[in-house]
């Protein structure tokens, strides 16, 4: 058993070395693939039908990625074999050819994508889903097979197939023809645009050239006419005459303009003078009218009517100065009998209400004020006494005259005297 295990390990090591050698060989394949892609490009130029056949072949191939993976999984399992020499099996060949190293694989995919990008859009597909069989072309040869092997693992990157109508399914050649016609139309359109630009430039040159020629011819004619007119004596005379006539007309027109402007200035000045005169007259007339109105407004007063009488003159009334009666102080009150000298003199009695009201009022005045009030009260009492004495004297004089004139009518006169004395006493009390 131990010897068999050693043989199996040795065989597996040899197999790994063979795989590495095969991978190293595959590393040198991209150069050959590049040549093959160039050949395929030349083959594409020969005709679009070969491209369609190649694409159909690539579609018919089975997915090599999945099959190879299954094969490698089987190879990785330990296989028990009897003792013997290790022979190179086709499994290892398929593995080495389909799975090169990573760097080479990435480069191959890029180159294969570059080689097959123009092919993906040219897949002819029938509406029913059946794929047309294409005859293999003899011109492509082995290079087409190599490109198909490289592009086989890239089947997943191809564009998804869309269902096409029955009219489009009549043949793939119609699509190819349409695309060719489109490319031809685009090329012709570009050429037409270039030709149109060149023609417009030529037309512009042609249009500008005759204009320049006409301008040059006009300048030549002008120079010729001036030289002929100045060279000949008749031309000189005519030019001198025309210049003199033209200058004479200019002078006449200038004189007429001056006269016209002078007349306009005179008219304007006259209008301004008239305006000033009218304004002055209007001011004078306004002043005169105002004076007339003032004179017309003045009128003479007519005589007063007979029934109108002036009111009598008002009599000026002498106002008696108002004085406040001040109540005398209690305890210092003098009797009225002391003031009056006799029975004939009327007694002055003050109302009780005023005395009672004065008694009820409390005394809250200070001493200096009381002294001043006492002095004023004494002065007033003296004045009253003097007046009463004068009244009594007058009454006595009247009595004497009355007795001398009419001794019989003494009684009524005495009554009248008493009434007058009472009136005078009341006046004295109010006035004092």
UniProtKB/Swiss-Prot annotation:
Keywords: Acetylation, Cytoplasm, Cytoskeleton, Microtubule. The modification N-acetylalanine is found at residue 2. One of its GO terms (biological process) is microtubule cytoskeleton organization. It comes from Arabidopsis thaliana (Mouse-ear cress). Residues 135-150, 354-370 have a biased composition (Polar residues). Expressed in seedlings. One of its GO terms (cellular component) is endoplasmic reticulum. The keyword Cytoplasm applies. Its main location: cytoplasm. Residues 1-251, 270-416 are annotated as: Disordered. This is Protein WVD2-like 4.
């Amino acid at each position: 058993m131990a010897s068999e295990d050693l043989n199996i390990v040795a065989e597996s090591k040899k197999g790994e070395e063979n795989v590495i050698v095969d991978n190293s060989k595959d590393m040198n394949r991209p150069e050959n693939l590049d040549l093959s892609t160039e050949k395929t490009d030349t083959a594409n130029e020969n005709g679009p039908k070969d491209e369609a056949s190649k694409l159909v072949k690539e579609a018919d191939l089975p997915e090599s990625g999945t099959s190879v993976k299954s094969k490698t999984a089987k190879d990785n399992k330990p296989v028990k074999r009897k003792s013997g020499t290790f022979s190179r099996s086709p499994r290892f060949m398929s593995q080495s050819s389909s799975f090169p190293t990573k760097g080479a694989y990435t480069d191959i995919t890029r180159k294969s994508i570059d080689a097959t990008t123009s092919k993906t859009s040219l897949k002819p597909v029938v509406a029913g889903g059946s794929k047309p069989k294409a005859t293999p072309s003899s011109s492509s040869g082995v290079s087409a097979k190599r490109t198909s092997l490289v592009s086989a693992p890239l089947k997943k990157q191809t564009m998804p197939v869309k269902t096409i109508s029955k009219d489009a399914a009549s043949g793939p050649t119609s699509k190819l023809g349409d695309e060719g016609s489109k490319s031809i139309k685009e090329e012709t359109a570009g050429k037409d645009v270039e030709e149109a630009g060149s023609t417009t430039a030529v037309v512009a040159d042609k249009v500008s050239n005759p204009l320049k020629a006409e301008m040059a011819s006009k300048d030549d004619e002008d120079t010729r006419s001036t030289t002929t007119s100045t060279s000949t004596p008749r031309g000189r005379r005519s030019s001198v005459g025309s210049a003199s006539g033209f200058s004479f007309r200019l002078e006449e027109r200038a004189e007429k303009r001056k006269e016209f402007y002078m007349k306009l200035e005179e008219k304007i000045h006259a209008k301004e003078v008239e305006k000033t005169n009218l304004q002055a007259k209007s001011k004078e007339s306004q002043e005169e009218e105002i004076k007339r109105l003032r004179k017309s407004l003045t009128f003479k007063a007519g005589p007063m009517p007979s029934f109108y009488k002036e009111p009598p003159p008002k009599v000026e009334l002498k106002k008696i100065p108002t004085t406040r009666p001040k109540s005398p102080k209690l305890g210092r009150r003098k009797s009225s009998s002391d003031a009056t000298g006799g029975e004939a003199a009327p007694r002055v009695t003050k109302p009780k209400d005023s005395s009672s009201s004065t008694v009820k009022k409390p005394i809250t005045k200070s001493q200096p004020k009381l002294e001043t009030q006492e002095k004023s009260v004494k002065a007033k009492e003296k004045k009253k006494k003097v007046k009463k004495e004068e009244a009594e004297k007058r009454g006595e004089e009247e009595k004497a005259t009355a007795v001398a004139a009419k001794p019989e009518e003494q009684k009524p006169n005495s009554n009248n005297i008493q009434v007058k004395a009472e009136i005078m006493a009341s006046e004295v009390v109010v006035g004092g």
